[in-house]
Curated annotation (Swiss-Prot):
Organism encoding this protein: Staphylococcus aureus (strain Mu50 / ATCC 700699)
Disulfide bonds: none
Lineage: Bacteria, Bacillati, Bacillota, Bacilli, Bacillales
Protein family: Belongs to the histone deacetylase family.
Function: Role in growth on acetoin or butanediol. Involved in the breakdown of these compounds used as a carbon source.
Designated name of the protein: Acetoin utilization protein AcuC
Pathway(s) this gene product operates in, as recorded in its UniProt entry: Ketone degradation; acetoin degradation
Length: 389
C-alpha cells in the first residue's frame, strides 16, 4: 500500500447517497460511491482518512438561506407543502423535485463541509475533500439546478464569521456558480471566481464577465465565460491566466474549490470539449495555489458531472490525489472495481486511467474558439489587476 497523508480528510458516508430526487434524475450520488471505492481498491485512500459528515444546524443553514426557505424544505421532506409554496421555493419541477427527508439529507451534505472547515481551522488536518458536496446553484431562498442547500456558500460564510478568515471560492464546473456568486455579491470577505461555459447557451444563463460585484463587493466577483466546444488547451490557458492574479490580489486565508467534471466531452448536459487531461490538471493547479498562497489550506468539493461511469470516478479520484500529493495516475484501473461495477453500469466501463479518445470529435473551429477565449481571459486579467492595485 502506498503511503497516505494524515493531513488530508475525506468526507464519506452512505448517508450522502440519500440525496436523490428520483431514480431517473441525472444527479446521481452513486458517483460518490463509485469514486470512493475506486480510490480504496487502488490503495490510494486509507479508511483512516475518511471522516463522517454531521447534520448542519438550522442556524448554520441560515448563514446563507432564509428562515422561511429552510422551513419549506422541512415541510417538503414530509410531503406537507402546498403547490403555491413549492412553486415559490423552486420545488415544483423535475429539476428540483421533492423527496423524502430532503432536509436532513441536504443538511448532511452541508455538515460534511463544515466538519472539514473545523478540522482545518483547528489545525487537525491541512486540507479536505468533500466530493459529495458542491451544490453551487442553490439560492438563499430558492432551490435551483439540482441544489437544495448551498454547502459551498454556507461553508465560506461559516469560515468568514467563525474564524475571521478571507475565503476564495474557485469554481471550475461547466455551469456558472450562480447561487454562490449572488450570496456574496456585495461582500468583500469572500471572493468568488467561476470559469464556465457561457450562459448564452447553458443553464443558469448568468456568469457574464461584467458581473463583478456591487458596493464593497465590487471586484470580488470574477467570471470567465468560455465558448461552447472549448478544448483542453484553451480551458487550461484561460484558467491559469485569470485565477492566479485573483489569488495574489485577494490574499485569501483558505480556498474552497468546486470541481465539477461536466466540462468533459462525454458529459450529456454541457457543450464543452475537454478531456480527462484538464480534469486531472485543474485540482493540481488549485493545490499549487493553496500551497503557494494559503499555507496549504483548501477544501475541494465535487459539483456537476453526469457521466457517472466513464468520467466522474476517474476525474474525482484525482481531486483527492492532488491533496495527498500523489501523481496523476496511468495504466489499468483495479480489476476488483471493474468486476464489481460492470454488472451495474449502463455502458462499458473504462479499463485505464487515461481517456481512450476513440469517440472524441475535434472541432474545426478550435483556433477561432481558443483565440476568442484568450482575448476575453486577457481582458479579465488586465481589468482585475488594474482595479485591485
Amino acid at each position: 500500500m502506498q503511503q497516505h497523508s494524515s493531513k488530508t480528510a475525506y468526507v464519506y458516508s452512505d448517508k450522502l447517497l440519500q440525496y436523490r430526487f428520483h431514480d431517473q434524475h441525472p444527479f446521481n450520488q452513486m458517483r460518490l460511491k463509485l469514486t470512493t471505492e475506486l480510490l480504496l481498491n487502488a490503495n490510494l485512500l486509507s479508511p483512516e482518512q475518511i471522516v463522517q459528515p454531521r447534520i448542519a444546524t438550522g442556524d448554520e443553514l441560515m448563514l446563507i438561506h432564509k428562515y422561511d426557505y429552510v422551513e419549506a424544505i422541512k415541510h417538503a421532506s414530509h410531503g406537507i407543502i402546498s403547490e403555491d409554496e413549492a412553486k415559490k421555493y423552486g420545488l415544483n419541477d423535475e429539476e428540483n423535485g421533492q423527496f423524502k427527508h430532503m432536509h436532513r439529507h441536504s443538511a448532511t451534505i452541508v455538515g460534511g463541509a463544515l466538519t472539514l472547515a473545523d478540522l482545518i481551522m483547528s489545525g487537525k488536518v491541512l486540507n479536505g475533500c468533500h466530493l459529495g458536496g458542491g451544490l453551487h446553484h442553490a439560492q438563499p431562498g430558492r432551490a435551483s439546478g439540482f441544489c437544495i442547500y448551498n454547502d459551498i456558500a454556507i461553508t465560506a460564510q461559516y469560515i468568514a464569521k467563525e474564524y475571521n478568515q478571507r475565503v476564495l471560492i474557485i469554481d471550475t464546473d461547466a455551469h456558472h456558480g450562480d447561487g454562490t456568486q449572488w450570496s456574496f455579491y456585495a461582500d468583500n470577505h469572500v471572493t468568488t471566481y467561476s470559469i464556465h461555459e457561457t450562459g448564452k447557451f447553458l443553464f443558469p444563463g448568468s456568469g457574464h464577465y461584467t458581473e463583478r460585484g456591487e458596493d464593497i463587493g465590487y471586484g470580488h466577483t470574477v467570471n470567465v465565460p468560455l465558448e461552447p466546444y472549448t478544448e483542453d488547451a484553451s480551458f487550461l490557458e484561460c484558467f491559469k491566466l485569470t485565477v492566479e492574479p485573483v489569488v495574489k490580489s485577494f490574499k485569501p486565508d483558505i480556498i474552497l474549490s468546486v470541481n465539477g467534471v461536466d466540462i468533459h466531452y462525454r458529459d450529456p448536459l454541457t457543450h464543452l470539449n475537454c478531456t480527462l487531461h484538464s480534469l486531472y490538471e485543474i485540482p493540481y493547479f488549485v493545490k499549487y495555489l493553496a500551497d503557494s498562497y494559503t499555507n496549504g489550506k483548501v477544501i475541494m468539493f465535487g459539483g456537476g458531472g453526469y457521466n457517472i461511469w466513464r468520467v466522474v470516478p476517474r476525474a474525482w479520484s484525482h481531486v483527492f490525489l492532488s491533496l495527498i500529493d500523489q501523481p496523476i495516475q496511468s495504466g489499468y484501473l483495479p480489476l476488483e472495481w471493474i468486476n464489481k461495477w460492470k454488472h451495474y453500469s449502463s455502458e462499458l466501463l473504462p479499463k485505464r486511467w487515461e481517456d481512450r479518445l476513440n469517440d472524441y470529435t475535434y472541432v474545426p473551429r478550435t483556433k477561432e474558439i481558443s483565440e476568442k477565449n484568450k482575448k476575453l481571459a486577457l481582458h479579465i486579467a488586465s481589468w482585475y489587476e488594474s482595479t485591485r492595485q
